[in-house]
A protein has these predicted regions:
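CBM-like, beta-strand-rich accessory domains located in the C-terminal region of large
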Residues: 1-192
Length: 192
């Protein structure tokens, strides 16, 4: 999973590259605590809106195939509060949350791309525009990506006005105002 914050406009780009030894279904999950999500399929783009008291997020999910979707207010397995007790040692049970799942057809390789636009209630967020099969425009950002299971997992994000280019092609190359940095992906050590 690659996550890129696109400037300070409340935009986030997420690119998931998934591989298995055999053909399996891949699931993309989103969750909210209080309200159900609004799910629309706008011209082949899955648009999921989540709200809370302080604001809202619009997730635009791009995939190579039609995805099977569902939403539930039940946990897959009951969530057990084992961490937060009150001063008398009582562990209050968790209330159910809302869970959205988009499932792919069977494939050994799959890729999802998502643009998330966060904004206040009543204000319009940035809506990504699909320019071509593999290119999006979101605000001042142009995103070229391979979401097909064929070919290499790759994406490029560019903002000409800000003089920024980010390229992912096995390693991440960031060019900002003429200065280039190359990052190599690594699995983080988890502190549990």
């Amino acid at each position: 999973r690659h996550i890129v914050e696109l400037g300070n406009a409340g935009l986030i780009f997420i690119y998931d590259e998934l591989e298995a030894d055999t053909a399996v279904t891949w699931s993309y999950l989103l969750h909210t605590i209080e309200h159900p999500m609004i799910i629309k399929n706008d011209k082949g783009v899955m648009h999921i809106t989540a709200t809370n008291a302080g604001g809202m997020s619009d997730a635009y999910l791009f995939a190579n195939d039609k995805l099977e979707t569902k939403q539930t207010d039940q946990f897959f397995y009951p969530a057990v509060n084992w961490l937060r007790a009150d001063d008398k040692g009582y562990f209050a049970p968790y209330k159910n949350h809302w869970h959205f799942t988009a499932t792919s057809p069977h494939s050994p390789v799959y890729r999802f791309a998502t643009v998330v636009s966060t904004h206040g209630q009543g204000s319009a967020g940035v809506v990504p525009e699909k320019i071509s099969k593999d290119t999006l425009k979101a605000g001042g950002w142009i995103i070229k990506m391979n979401i097909s299971p064929k070919g290499k997992a790759t994406f490029t994000i560019e903002n000409k006005a800000e003089n920024i280019v980010l390229e992912y092609d096995g390693s991440t190359k960031i060019t900002e105002e003429g200065r280039t940095v190359i990052l190599k992906d690594q699995v983080p050590e988890l502190e549990i």
